[in-house]
């Protein structure tokens, strides 16, 4: 029986693309660079903040000093904007409360910077998660399992009773690296065909399908 539900954050629990888009747009404009569209922004999400900024710079971030200056400016803006527009996907609150009512545990393992992840979750989902982990500088992001293994040990996550839920290839690959079932959600930032090419255990189109998908896992 699945007792440990490990969620991605951006594109899985929250639609954070508008906040990310505003922060990157303002930073690009401040540096005299061409803007990117909201749709483009969505395709950059999933690999962590530094990968996101590299993608938005479209090759202009190859200079290390320039990239670090730009990245610092972006992070200041994103920290200021991240609580303004982010919205909970329909059905997510019910999923999380059901997990809690069943005596099971929900966790977040995200490539978003750790401090911002904790701040956002404390604001939007107080007391619904047993553990929250974001990316820490100097460590490898998902799908590397090094930090997850430490996280799992700290929170008593038993992998045979676990499932990984997310909207992007790193989430599916993370679950596969851990040897646990994966549920890919199509309402986030990755096309269904792309998700299917990574062979998740289940694919769902709406948050209200997540728990039924978990029940159907053999």
Regions found by a protein language model. Give the residues of each.
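Residue-level recognition of specific faces of alpha-helices
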Residues: 74, 91, 95, 105, ...
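Asp-based, Mg2+/Mn2+-dependent phosphohydrolase catalytic module
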Residues: 1-3, 39, 100, 114, ...
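N-terminal helical cap/lid subdomain that shapes the substrate entry/recognition surface
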Residues: 2-94, 101-105, 113-118
């Amino acid at each position: 029986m699945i007792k440990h539900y490990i969620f991605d954050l951006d594109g899985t629990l929250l639609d954070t693309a508008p906040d990310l888009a505003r922060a990157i747009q303002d930073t690009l404009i401040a540096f005299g660079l061409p803007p990117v569209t909201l749709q483009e922004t969505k395709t950059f999400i999933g690999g962590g903040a530094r990968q996101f900024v590299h993608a938005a710079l479209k090759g202009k971030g190859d200079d290390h000093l320039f990239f670090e200056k730009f990245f610092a400016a972006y992070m200041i803006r994103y920290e200021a904007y991240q609580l303004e527009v982010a919205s909970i996907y329909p059905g997510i609150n019910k999923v999380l409360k059901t997990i809690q009512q069943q005596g099971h545990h929900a966790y977040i393992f995200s490539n978003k910077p750790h401090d911002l992840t904790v701040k956002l979750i404390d604001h939007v989902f107080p007391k619904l998660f047993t553990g929250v982990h974001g990316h820490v500088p100097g460590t490898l992001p998902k799908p590397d399992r090094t930090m997850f293994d430490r996280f799992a040990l700290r929170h008593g996550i038993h992998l045979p009773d676990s499932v990984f839920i997310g909207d992007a290839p790193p989430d599916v690959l993370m679950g596969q690296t851990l040897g646990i079932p994966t549920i890919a959600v199509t309402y986030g930032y990755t096309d269904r065909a792309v998700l299917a090419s990574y062979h998740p255990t289940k694919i769902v189109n709406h948050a209200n399908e997540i728990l039924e998908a978990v029940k159907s896992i053999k």
